[in-house]
A protein has these predicted regions:
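Pro/Thr/Ser/Gly-rich low-complexity, intrinsically disordered linker/stalk tracts
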Residues: 36-67, 100, 113-130
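Noncatalytic carbohydrate-binding groove/subsite architecture in carbohydrate-active enzymes
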Residues: 285-299, 328, 336-504, 509
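Glycan-recognition and catalytic regions of carbohydrate-active enzymes
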Residues: 502, 509, 513-583, 619-622
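Carbohydrate-binding surface patches
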Residues: 564-605, 609-612, 646-651
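C-terminal beta-strand-rich structural cap/linker in extracellular carbohydrate-active enzymes
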Residues: 629-653
Length: 653
């Protein structure tokens, strides 16, 4: 026989009895040798192995090996230590049991009935989450540009008289037409044109004893202090106050001096009688400095340097409309701007002689035309971009008087702002229902931009017929103050933007509050309309008590700019009482969800989200933020999808 056959036979004869015969002549299991028994062999090692990493998966492909009936897929997180994770016949494998950010190593071997091949060349893949989509809107925060946020911007008018559930207000104002002819000695006032020019005790309501002088004001301030609010009360500048409570006053030949008494700013100019908290009511005069003194006697320290809940004083109310609202005392000819400034200085000095630290608000313009032209004062010839508005004249007069007096005679430039924006037909303040058109919604939610935005032109008589362009009233006023009377503050003590029963009202009001804080406005008081306005009050809850308790927006504003201010704005703050805490209020005033990136402010910890939308509000009797749960944050960027027409508070700590 051939030599080779003899060698095979000898090998079989010497094989130990316990070794199975099928092993004889095998090339070794898994070693890639030649098979025996039938002349077959194990397949060769696979070639062309590739690994493609994706989000939470690694996809493998390789070339088929001749004679292979299947393949072993092997994996490890360190090179050269792979273990089998799958056996299959296909030449592709999707490994979806992986973690993003971890590198995985792979080899593949082929097998058939004769054995297993050697391993393929090793490959690796690192699955990663996909990058976030491009932001619809980018918000850029500059933490180096900051302003303190005044605690008095979260204000209202006649807090105690409001029956709706109130948010966490900080500031209350006793304002409105009623206070112009209020007589502190007897608590009578006149309604003016609001109600048949009626002399009555309207201001001395529940808990007020009209027989006690100044009780209408004392009870107002006391209630505010009990609620933790600062107060703004109105002092009488027009010149006449109600003598009685005997009903309507004739306007046929005003004023009827049998029904009114004369206001005197400084008692010592006409009388040597000392101040008293119980002045006679039979004389002809009512003294303003005595009024302030009496309030301090009743509520000691309210006009001090830094009381816990300060009381500020306002020099009357909307004097540029006295001939319309208070015909009974003013007549049909209004006070001139010159006389008004003179009277303001005289009253302010009389009050500050008594209380040097008193903070005084004026001129309390009713709106744009008062600021611009004193409602058509013939001594003024204002031009849109000129330094010849009533505001310029007022600031110059106050500056001159302050220099002579040795301190500011008016501390805060105060005006009212009932938005004049329209949808082309209807003014936003008249859009009060729960069903609004898209055009009406946009008119409301964009209207706050007229406070500051030099690129935004609302549709109103102001922009179309007077200025011929954007209003940006706060920017204009601040520039005039900086030029003429640096250091004077700004307040808006009555304002409305409509949408009281619609998410549009929530958005507009939240925007107002963000604007007030970011621009350093000193004080602001929302004017509650008649009827319901839960959606507007809800906006305060985005800044105050948004967690249903006492979590508030911070007290330092960070500069924020938006790549699409018509769609999304974000207001940013830090908290001096909690280092590292950052609070954002993000407003989407568009009708589509916006993926928003907020960049530039270092963040750490957890973001707690609270949100208001039309859908969430529709299920609530008291509209308020809904907790959306936590979100981990780090670095200096945060991304979030803001629902259409929504207000979202993001509290990072």
């Amino acid at each position: 026989m051939p030599i080779a056959d003899r060698q095979t036979r000898i090998s079989l004869l010497w094989l130990p009895a316990f070794v199975p015969l099928w092993l004889a002549g095998c090339g070794g299991y898994g070693g890639g040798g030649n098979g025996g028994g039938g002349g077959g062999s194990a397949p060769s090692a696979p070639t062309g192995l590739t690994a493609t990493a994706a989000n939470a998966q690694v996809n493998l492909t390789w070339n088929a090996s001749a004679a292979a009936t299947g393949y072993y897929v092997k994996r490890s997180t360190s090179s050269g230590t792979e273990v089998q994770i799958a056996a299959q016949s296909a030449t592709a494998y999707n490994d979806n049991s992986v973690n993003n950010g971890t590198t995985y190593y792979y080899v593949v071997s082929a097998y058939n009935s004769y054995g297993q091949s050697a391993n393929s060349a090793e490959v690796s893949g690192t699955p990663l989450a996909p990058p976030p989509p491009a932001a619809d809107v980018t918000i850029t925060i500059d933490p180096t540009k900051t302003k303190p946020i005044s605690p008095y911007i979260y204000g209202t008018n006649f807090y105690s008289g409001n029956t709706a559930p109130q948010p966490n207000f900080t500031f209350d104002r006793a304002g409105g037409n009623r206070w112009t002819a209020y007589n502190w000695e007897n608590n009578y006032s006149n309604a003016g044109g609001d109600y048949i020019y009626n002399n009555d005790l309207y201001l001395c309501n529940a808990g007020c004893n009209a027989a006690i002088p100044a009780e209408a004001v004392r009870t107002f301030i006391a209630a505010d202090q009990s609620a933790g609010l600062a107060s703004l009360v109105t002092f009488q500048l027009q010149g006449l106050v109600s003598a009685d409570g005997n009903g309507p006053v004739s306007t046929a030949n005003p004023p009827d001096m049998t029904r009114f008494k004369t206001v005197v700013d400084k008692k010592s100019t006409v009388s040597s009688v000392p101040f008293t908290t119980t002045p006679p009511t039979t004389d002809a005069n009512v003294f303003m400095d005595e009024f302030a003194w009496a309030l301090d006697q009743k509520l000691p320290g309210i006009f001090g340097a830094n009381p816990t809940h300060p009381t500020f004083l306002s020099l009357d109310n909307e004097p540029d409309l006295w001939n319309a609202t208070h015909l009974e005392v003013q007549g049909s000819t209004n006070i001139s701007s010159t006389n008004f400034i003179t009277k303001s200085v005289t009253l302010s000095e009389a009050l500050k002689d008594q209380f040097p630290n008193l903070v005084i608000f004026g001129p309390v313009n009713y709106g744009f035309n008062g600021i611009y032209s004193w409602q058509g004062d013939p001594s003024l010839s204002p031009t849109p971009n000129g330094a010849n508005w009533f505001a310029d004249k007022y600031l110059a007069g106050i500056k001159t008087a302050s220099a002579a007096y040795g301190k500011p005679v008016v501390d805060v430039y105060d005006f009212h702002w009932y938005s004049e924006a329209t949808d082309g037909t209807t003014r936003v303040t008249n859009m009060t229902g729960s069903s609004l058109t898209d055009a009406q919604v946009q008119a409301i939610v964009q209207s706050p931009r007229s406070l500051w935005d030099t690129t935004f032109k609302e549709n109103s008589w102001i922009t179309n017929s007077v200025l011929g362009g954007p209003i940006y009233i706060l920017g204009r006023l601040q520039a005039k103050i900086d030029a003429e009377n640096p250091g004077m503050k700004i307040a808006i003590t009555e304002y409305e933007n409509g949408g009281f029963n619609h998410i549009a009202g929530t958005i507009a009001q939240a925007d107002n509050l963000g604007i007030f804080g970011s621009l350093g406005i000193f004080a602001a008081n929302f004017w509650p309309p008649g009827g319901t306005y839960s959606y507007t009050l809800a906006a305060f809850r985005a800044f105050r008590g948004f967690d249903g308790a006492n979590a508030n927006f911070g007290d330092i504003s960070l500069q924020s700019t938006s790549s699409d201010v018509a769609s999304v704005v974000v207001y940013a703050s830090t908290d001096t009482t909690a280092p590292g805490r950052v609070v954002f209020v993000a407003i989407n005033r568009s009708n589509a969800a916006k993926f928003t990136a907020i960049n530039g402010q270092a963040l750490s910890g957890t973001a707690h989200l609270y949100q208001m939308t039309a859908a969430s509000a529709s299920t609530q009797s008291v509209v308020q933020p809904v907790s959306m749960g936590p979100m981990a944050v780090s670095g200096s960027s945060l991304t979030i999808t803001l629902p259409a027409y929504s207000v979202t508070t993001i509290d990072v700590h």
